[in-house]
Regions:
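Short loop/turn microsegments at loop-to-beta-strand junctions
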Residues: 21-23, 34, 165, 314-317
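Short, well-ordered beta-strand elements
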Residues: 34-37, 319, 325-334
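Short, gly/Ser/Thr-rich active-site loops of penicillin-recognizing serine hydrolases
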Residues: 261, 271, 276-280, 337-352
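Glycine-rich phosphate/pyrophosphate-binding beta-alpha loops
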Residues: 239-246, 307-319, 332-338
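Short, glycine/proline-biased beta-turn/loop segments that scaffold the active-site neighborhood
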Residues: 81-94, 177
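Short, surface-exposed loop or secondary-structure junction motifs
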Residues: 32, 95-302
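Short, conserved catalytic-motif segment at the N-terminal edge
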Residues: 2-56, 78-83
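Active-site SXXK
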Residues: 8-12, 31, 54-82, 154-159, ...
Length: 352
């Protein structure tokens, strides 16, 4: 059986046994797509099959895309990881560096409690609110996950450095060079309406989320289940580069494949080393550098044997394996405690 056939067999079994409902799993080796598996259905009615062009909510997988934009600006000399944010951002009050924003050690992880979800449609307003944040911890000391604020903080730094709005920057620096057609942060309404919904089991309960743009977003987290926000056009049209991205797995995989041979590298190997080496914090998700999560292959802590990228709520992920020159992306639509997202990469490596 071919490698792709083995993957399809594994994914189909996950659907047949009720562990998953609909998935995309894409793998590139250097510049060649070696697995393009689209399995299952868009919802529990099982009437519409998942295809390569279906677009899914990718939640925090968006953070890796946002980080790449910052690294592009840094490589061009327009941002310095060690420079104060206020050097680039007029009116920014917190005494933190660009690197502390990227590494989530800035202590700016909590949005003001008076924000409402419709505010996320207005980039300039959200950027102005980031200016007012005060660190809740001593900057540079502890890693604390910046669930939502990361996107506006890091994203606006890239915008200020380039002189362009976020969506133009994404289009010109990532989508056009790589030929991506299904990646959006702040999707147009006609795209938002077609995004695959996240479906769940009745007993899954992350809280009492009310899909209402007049509800407050408090304590650094949208009141759950978090996915319900991204089951609305309001969520999908939000320009929130920490969590509101929508994409096909193919486009996410191409982004990471650019680091190992697909078309033109978005950043150089030297810049990638800076992104992973200059700021290394060990977290519950492995190591974290400037905007990327990463882990070492074979317990060899050298940066030519690293797997980096970002995962997202509900199991979406995009990663690059520099040792084996592989890139991966995974999308899924079933919110379940039986998910395969924690094991699919290990299973794939066994198939090689």
């Amino acid at each position: 059986m071919s490698l792709e056939g083995k993957v399809y067999d594994y994914l189909n079994k996950a659907v047949e046994t009720g562990r998953e409902n609909g998935m995309q799993f894409v793998v590139f080796h250097k510049d060649k797509c070696i697995v393009n598996a689209n399995v299952g259905y868009t919802d529990f009615s099982k009437t519409e099959k998942i295809t390569e062009d279906h677009i899914f909510p990718i939640f925090s997988t968006t953070k890796g895309i946002c980080a790449t934009l910052v690294h592009i600006m840094a490589e061009r000399g327009k941002l310095d990881y060690n420079q104060k944010v206020s050097h680039y951002w007029p009116g920014f009050k917190a005494n933190v560096t660009v690197g502390q924003i990227l590494g989530m050690t800035a202590g700016l992880y909590r949005e003001q409690s008076d924000l409402i979800a419709s505010d996320f449609l207005d980039w300039n307003y959200m950027a102005s609110r980031m200016c007012e944040l005060t660190p809740l911890e001593t900057p540079g000391v502890n890693f604390t996950y910046h669930t939502m604020t990361f996107g506006w903080l890091a994203g606006n730094l890239a915008c200020l450095a380039s002189g362009k709005d976020f969506q133009t920057l994404l289009e010109e620096e990532i989508k056009q060079p790589l030929g991506l057609k299904n990646l959006y942060v702040g999707a147009p309404k006609e795209v938002a309406e077609k995004v695959v919904n996240i479906v769940d089991e009745p007993y899954i309960n992350d809280g009492d989320f009310i899909v209402d743009q007049e509800r407050d977003i408090k304590k650094g987290w949208c009141r759950g289940p978090f996915y319900q926000w991204m089951n609305t056009n309001l969520g999908r049209m939000s320009i929130a580069p920490a969590a509101s991205g929508v994409s096909s797995a193919m486009d996410i995989a191409k982004h990471y494949a650019s680091f190992v041979g697909y078309k033109k590298p978005l950043i150089s190997k030297n810049q990638l080393i800076k992104a992973l080496e200059d700021n290394r914090f060990s977290t519950q998700w492995g190591y974290r550098g400037y905007g990327y999560q990463f882990s070492f292959m074979d317990n060899d802590k050298s940066l030519d044997k690293v797997r980096f990228g970002h995962n997202g709520y509900n199991g979406s992920f995009g990663f690059c394996d520099t040792k084996n020159e592989l890139s991966f992306a995974f999308n899924k639509n079933y919110k379940s405690d039986k998910t395969i997202n924690g094991e699919i990469l290990n299973e794939f490596y066994k198939m090689l």
